[in-house]
A protein has these predicted regions:
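Single conserved hydrophobic/aromatic residue that forms the stacking wall/gate
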Residues: 1-6, 11
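Non-catalytic C-terminal accessory modules of carbohydrate-active enzymes
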Residues: 16-166
């Protein structure tokens, strides 16, 4: 099954592909467009496409949301709208040493940040008052004393994760 780059499926199922398309400046990527003078999201990845009538095409337009969703892992829970319950599924690419993202919810600021050195990732998340979160430990990582998910009440939480595979 195919998905649009930056879409929910690509972010969740192929985070490394989404990351590469976001940071590279070779074909195909957002950086490719910028490197070649584009200031908007084109209809096609190819710059010489015969039919490219849209110079502001939403199909590839999830780059902004991708940062807080894809790397920060900040998602609402569909069963508790408005970020009363937050689903956290951060992604830690080995080639990136730090990241920080925030989202202003109706309950307050949600912040997800991390630093990475070698196999160690220090993850910090801030959950606003009257909210709670479920952190899904990413595949290939371990958290001492936890498996699968960690339930987090409102407040600031610092979690040390260790990469168990490259």
């Amino acid at each position: 099954q195919r998905s649009l780059v930056g879409s929910e499926m690509c972010i969740r199922d192929s985070p490394e592909t989404a990351y590469r398309v976001a940071v590279q400046d070779s074909y195909p990527s957002w950086g490719w467009w910028v490197r070649n003078g584009s200031t908007t999201l084109l209809e096609n990845w190819r710059l010489d496409a015969e039919r490219d009538i849209s110079d502001n095409h939403m199909m590839f337009g999830e780059i902004g949301a991708w940062f807080y969703k894809g790397l920060g892992g900040i998602y609402p829970d569909e069963c508790e709208p408005g970020f009363r319950h937050i689903r956290l599924t951060p992604y830690f690419p080995a080639s990136l040493s730090s990241f920080s993202a925030s989202h202003t919810s109706p309950y307050g600021q949600i912040m997800s940040s991390w630093t990475s050195k070698g196999r160690l990732v220090n993850y910090t998340v801030s959950i606003p008052a009257n909210s709670r979160a479920t952190l899904t430990i990413p595949d290939g990582f371990i958290v001492k004393g936890h498996e699968g998910t960690i339930e987090l009440p409102s407040g600031v939480h610092r979690i040390e994760m260790r990469r168990i595979k490259n």
